[in-house]
Structures are given as structure tokens and as C-alpha cells.
Amino acid sequence: MSKAQAVRRIGILGGTFDPVHIGHLRSALEVTEFMGLEELRLLPNARPPHRDTPQVAAEDRLAMVREAVQGVERLSVDARELERDKPSYTIDTLESVRAELGADDQLFLVLGWDAFCGLPGWHRWEELLQHCHILVLQRPDADVEPPDELRNLLAARSESDPTAMSGPAGSISFVWQTPLAVSATQIRQLLASGRSVRFLVPDAVLAYIEAHELYRAPN
């Protein structure tokens, strides 16, 4: 009899990454280590239906994420949403990733608190937990109250210990993260005003931004 294959634990962290910065990367690393993930995939959104249009081209955002995770164990890049010629709905991505995994493999969708509170506005949001667990990155300063639809969902699907989430999908749990006061909006504003963003983004990302003259104010 062949030995049973070990269950894989895969995470997905989506975002516009416009640009990717140390806040994204620190959260990704902390979740990966805390949850014992085999891999956490940073997944740049092409045309996110719930966000403003990214300021720079998809290929530049993808390249910056690749530069950011180069050589970082267990962090990787997934470009599938950039290959779609239509709005990038999370449910489509989860269905696609789930189809590539084994039936028992665990898939974790990592969301920030604000994104989680906005779930009822997402396309086919009620189906998300059919394909994954949801890990919510909780901040001490989070002040948004979840809508009633999510209160009901949390009552039914919440797991107090994220490391105890069992099965391939179906539960929600919270992971505390180290709050870093950095945002992509702040970085874009600094760059547009000609100021340095060193130490807010990895050196390789800064080098890419400078080489391609991204986020500069129009002349």
C-alpha cells in the first residue's frame, strides 16, 4: 500500500500591490510562519472590481512583486489574475487554485480586516468558504464593525484558534499582525513629490521603480 500523501497548506494573499511594500511582505511572512504554510502566494489583481484602477501597468506591479519575494523561502507569486481579460473575481481564482490541489489540501484566503468587512459586496461571496478557509489579519486599531451578514457567518463558521482549522475549507479565523504604518497610497504620494521611499519597500523594488520611472508626478 502506498503511503498517504501529506496534506498541503497553501495561502493566497491578493492585492493591487501598487506598489508592494514592507507591510504586505511582513504580513505575508508572519502568516506563513504562524500557520506553517507550505507556500503563500502573492497574487496581483488585474482589474479589481472593488478598488480604484491601479496607477501603473499590471506587468510592472507583477515584476515588483517578483523582485520583492526573490529568494524568500515559502513566498511566491501567482500571476493567474493578470492573465484574465475580464474583472478578477476572487471566487474565480479560488476555483482555479482549488482545482490544482488535492481534495484534502488546505487553502487559506488571507484578507485584511477592511477587505473582510467588505465581503458582502463581493461577487458570489457566499461561495468562498466552499473552496477555502479565510484568515483575517487583525489590527489593534481596527475600528470597522462587520455587517450583519458577516456576524451571522462568523457565528456559524468562526474558529478561535487559527492553527486548529481542519479540513480543506469552510472556516474563518483571525491572526494578529504587527501593525506597520505604511500604505501604498503614502508611497505613491512620496514618490510623486520626489521624496525617498527607501526602507518602505525592498531595495529591489525601489531599484525597479527608479529604473522605470514609476509613480512620478506628471510634468
UniProtKB/Swiss-Prot annotation:
A Pfam family of this chain: CTP_transf_like
Keywords: ATP-binding, NAD, Nucleotide-binding, Nucleotidyltransferase, Pyridine nucleotide biosynthesis, Transferase
Enzyme Commission identifier(s): 2.7.7.18
Pathway field: Cofactor biosynthesis; NAD(+) biosynthesis; deamido-NAD(+) from nicotinate D-ribonucleotide: step 1/1
Disulfide bridge positions per record: none
Catalysed transformations (reactions): nicotinate beta-D-ribonucleotide + ATP + H(+) = deamido-NAD(+) + diphosphate
Presence of keyword ATP-binding: yes
GO biological process: NAD biosynthetic process
Top-level taxon in the UniProt lineage: Bacteria
Molecular function (Gene Ontology), one example: nicotinate-nucleotide adenylyltransferase activity
InterPro entries: Cyt_trans-like, NadD/NMNAT, Rossmann-like_a/b/a_fold
PANTHER family for this protein: NICOTINATE-NUCLEOTIDE ADENYLYLTRANSFERASE-RELATED (PTHR39321), PHOSPHOPANTETHEINE ADENYLYLTRANSFERASE (PTHR39321:SF3)
Family membership noted in the UniProt record: Belongs to the NadD family.
Its job: Catalyzes the reversible adenylation of nicotinate mononucleotide (NaMN) to nicotinic acid adenine dinucleotide (NaAD).
Official protein name in the record: Probable nicotinate-nucleotide adenylyltransferase
Source species of the chain: Pseudomonas putida (strain W619)
